[in-house]
Amino acid sequence: MTATGIAEVIQRYYPDWDPPPDHYEWNKCLCPFHGDETPSAAVSYDLQGFNCLACGVRGDVISIIRHEEEVSFAEAVRIAEGLSVGGNIPVQRKPARKPSRRVFGESRSSGSSGSTVRPGIRGRSTPWS
């Protein structure tokens, strides 16, 4: 990975924290933010996210920096870019998700043009006609 990872950012503020090995999508670990005895947090290297079920700290690289440094979003982005390998590589953004539902008015086949009314409806009588 060429950009700053979530584990590197957390280790910057908590050097004694041991990041979990990358085995699953969400890897259980001890939370460095409140110091616990049993794993109550999880790190995702694929999604670049952190979530603790005990203390509620969650987020990505930018939100962890904002939480620790108490800075604005723009300043957190500048800090993260300074931490990345080479110093001028932009921070890795979260992968874009596809919308799970169709937007009202979109046809099912995006390539079709013309009327959006299905042919079977035109021939039917309606209660108000």
UniProtKB/Swiss-Prot annotation:
GO terms for biological process: DNA replication, synthesis of primer. Keywords: Metal-binding, Zinc, Zinc-finger. InterPro entries: DNA_primase_Znf_CHC2, DnaG_primase, Znf_CHC2. One of its GO terms (molecular function) is DNA binding. Residues 106-115 have a biased composition (Low complexity). Pfam families: Zn_ribbon_DnaG. The keyword Cell inner membrane does not apply. Residues 87-129 are annotated as: Disordered. The keyword Zinc-finger applies. PANTHER family: DNA PRIMASE. This is Gene 58 protein.
